[in-house]
Amino acid sequence: AMKMSFELEIGAQAPLGFWDPLGLLADADQERFERLRYVEVKHGRIAMLAIAGHLTQQNARLPGMLSNSANLSFADMPNGVAALSKIPPGGLAQIFGFIGFLELAVMKNVEGSFPGDFTLGGNPFASSWDAMSEETQESKRAIELNNGRAAQMGILALMVHEELNNKPYVINDLLGASYNFN
């Protein structure tokens, strides 16, 4: 495989430019780069959903029961990492089974497209996406990539602070805004 240069790829932009401190792409070809970019985009999307879910669950809960057999209501579920310890084993198996199904059967990258294109030939926003200039599409992809990177750091920070002192919302502490977490 021929050694490639990735300084001009989407996401290699100010202020860091191309940043690969672990050298994951030191001897990589375009195929390896695209595989790692695919993984980065997917993890970024999951992290953006995780941040939204963490903040939503902190302020609102669904009515009703999560598990009748375990006598567990949605209101009884803790937020954050602690929720994993309350989900019944059968529920965890369902969650991981569904994730596995999505990973193996549904969320496939469109061949010949950019990493992270999961349109599967049925993108409901295709007409608006296709109407954008190539420059605008690249800008949107760079924005998504950077928001995903920020969300990955954000959800990691929430989990670390939750484990350190059960106070994940550092900004509330800095501003003196009280909150109850779990």
UniProtKB/Swiss-Prot annotation:
Q: Which InterPro entries match?
A: Chloro_AB-bd_pln, Chloroa_b-bind
Identify the keywords attached in UniProt to this record, alphabetized.
Chlorophyll, Chloroplast, Chromophore, Light-harvesting polypeptide, Membrane, Photosynthesis, Photosystem II, Plastid, Thylakoid, Transit peptide, Transmembrane, Transmembrane helix
- Function in brief: The light-harvesting complex (LHC) functions as a light receptor, it captures and delivers excitation energy to photosystems with which it is closely associated. Energy is transferred from the carotenoid and chlorophyll C (or B) to chlorophyll A and the photosynthetic reaction centers where it is used to synthesize ATP and reducing power.
Name the chain's protein: Fucoxanthin-chlorophyll a-c binding protein D, chloroplastic
Define the transit peptide region by residue numbers: 1-4
Q: Name one GO cellular component term.
A: light-harvesting complex
- Cell location: Plastid, Chloroplast thylakoid membrane
Give a yes or no for keyword Chloroplast in this entry: yes
- Indicate the quaternary assembly: The LHC complex of chromophytic algae is composed of fucoxanthin, chlorophyll A and C bound non-covalently by fucoxanthin chlorophyll proteins (FCPs). The ratio of pigments in this LHC is; fucoxanthin: chlorophyll C: chlorophyll A; (0.6-1): (0.1-0.3): (1).
Q: Which GO terms describe its biological process?
A: photosynthesis, light harvesting
The organism is: Macrocystis pyrifera (Giant kelp)
Q: How does it sit in the membrane?
A: Multi-pass membrane protein
| Transmembrane as UniProt keyword | yes
Q: Which family does it belong to?
A: Belongs to the fucoxanthin chlorophyll protein family.
Q: Which residue windows are transmembrane per the record?
A: 46-66, 87-107, 148-168
Q: Which GO terms describe its molecular function?
A: chlorophyll binding
Query: Pfam families given for it?
Result: Chloroa_b-bind (PF00504)
Q: Which superkingdom is the protein from?
A: Eukaryota
